[in-house]
Design a protein with these regions (language model features):
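Boundary segments of small protein-protein interaction reader/adaptor domains
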Residues: 1-254
């Protein structure tokens, strides 16, 4: 299990469940260091004053937003009160939460293995899973307060930070959002979707880009020559006859 990022209590009503927060995902991306191509030496980042051309010590760095300069002390006035509690404010149907609102995923795990802690954790997870509801609450991580949704995944409590409503763009102005469609085209499109439908199997989808990068690194390490493959022609032109295209697509899946 990943290291704990936060330790506190999950609070609902008069019940407090001691929990730890751990990341539910791991970063498998390849991270490259920047080097000077001339001598392969690492590149260093320096904070330089654009007027003086000199490096600025960290303690002399201020912050500006929209023309207003603020000190660290002034910025700290917005910091939320640090607490060790995730306060559940309400329960909602999980299906009602638009996936666009989900941000970063974590797991909540029992903080300790005492009988009372495990029983309370198991009770909450079981009831939430049975009711198909998610808990909404807030908590402070480091110096920022987050809105969170807590749901059940394979018997464990999974916490996702949520984006606030004004961070999610609406669909106004998107061509094709809403409007009328032709019944015959809808019927054929439904058939095509059904032909392509399958069960969700995450193991069936790999990060092909990362695999190609790893293969390039292995080949370069062995002294091989790296050549960029020819790209497949992109299909960017609109379909002149949508109905004909749907029917032709269905034939390939018949």
């Amino acid at each position: 299990m990943a290291r704990s990022l936060w330790t506190g209590s999950l609070s609902f009503g008069l019940v407090n469940v001691p929990v730890q927060l751990v990341s539910a995902v791991r970063d498998l991306d390849l991270h490259f260091r920047q080097l000077h191509a001339k001598d392969d030496m690492p590149i260093e980042t320096q904070r330089v004053c654009s007027k003086e051309g000199k490096e600025v010590p960290y303690e002399e760095i201020g912050r500006e937003y929209d023309g207003v300069v603020l000190t660290d002390e002034e910025l700290s006035a917005a910091d939320p009160a640090k607490t060790r509690t995730i306060d559940i404010e309400s329960f909602v149907k999980l299906a009602e939460i638009d996936p666009l609102y989900f941000d970063h995923p974590y797991y909540l795990i029992p903080a300790g293995e005492t009988d009372g802690t495990v029983r309370a954790y198991r009770l909450l997870a079981g009831v939430m899973e049975q009711s198909e509801r998610a808990a909404l609450g807030r908590f402070v991580l480091r110096t920022k307060e987050y809105l969170v949704a807590i749901r059940v995944r394979d018997g464990a409590l999974a916490l996702s930070t949520l984006r606030f409503h004004d961070e999610v763009r609406d669909t106004d102005g998107i061509p094709g959002a809403g409007g009328r469609t032709k019944p015959k085209e809808v019927k054929q499109a439904v058939k095509l979707i059904e032909a392509l439908s399958t069960d969700w199997n995450p193991e069936g989808y790999d990060d092909e880009y990362r695999k190609r990068l790893q293969a390039i690194v292995r080949k370069k390490r062995k002294g091989g020559e790296i050549k960029r493959p020819e790209a497949d022609p992109e299909r960017t032109q609109p379909v002149p006859d949508l109905m004909a295209a749907l029917e032709e697509s269905l034939k390939s899946y018949a």
